[in-house]
């Protein structure tokens, strides 16, 4: 809009309080229809001309710029006389136009402040209008801000079904407990039978005797050692399952933890080691059976050796089943 004679060239619409002010103070809604306004210095002529315009809204936010201060009767430079000497109609039109612009700015400020104080910006209006990919994930509503100004974290993209996970943990846990118990039973029986493999053979009239023990066969020593290791390992795993049950309410830990991965590796290693030693002991027992030693009183030696090797094979089967259960559970959970 054009400037009147003698006005400061720097004053324009951008210099009005609605564009220039950065601090909002207390809102005063005061009618100036009577020519009275708090803090304003108006001369009689200005009061008369000012009363011809509509009522204005005063926003208490600090000093006004030169152009607005001039409309309230304050001097604004050497052009004051020239403005007062202008025609009454032109000056009245200019003053009313500026007051109208100021009224609009003040009312916009007052409406915005009232809206913010009444919580209009906390409504869900904009959340409902959100489009997919803009401001919300998949068009869902964004969470409202907290009281202290911190924005709440967005909702999780995917939540694992807790009920189904608990059922799977209980199912796999029951299977693992049964397999661990079977490993302990068969390894204990195998090492007990192998440890009792001792026999003394006496000749006629006890002129001579011959002692035989499992320590004389290397493969028997190997299978006995693996039975002890697997038995201790199964006992430790069984105790850890019960500790996990008492602490977290489930028999198995998460397959993504280090303990679960180590358990899977140890199951695989011990299973292969046990089946290897059991196979070697089975070969030795077969060779002893083919000879002439398994006759008479020596039959018990061959039977005990074969029984101990058989128990080791059963223990291997249950240990391999445990490793398979852990692998299936790992693939089932990570593949969801």
From Swiss-Prot:
Residues 192-222, 283-307 are extracellular. It holds the Pfam family CASP_dom. It is found in: Cell membrane. The keyword Cell wall biogenesis/degradation does not apply. Its main location: membrane. InterPro entries: CASP_dom. GO terms for cellular component: plasma membrane. Residues 1-170, 244-261, 329-336 are cytoplasmic. Keywords: Cell membrane, Membrane, Transmembrane, Transmembrane helix. The chain crosses the membrane at residues 171-191, 223-243, 262-282, 308-328. It is a multi-pass membrane protein. Coiled coil: none annotated. The keyword Transmembrane applies. Belongs to the Casparian strip membrane proteins (CASP) family. Homodimer and heterodimers. PANTHER family: CASP-LIKE PROTEIN 4A3, CASP-LIKE PROTEIN 4A4. This is CASP-like protein UU1. It comes from Physcomitrium patens (Spreading-leaved earth moss).
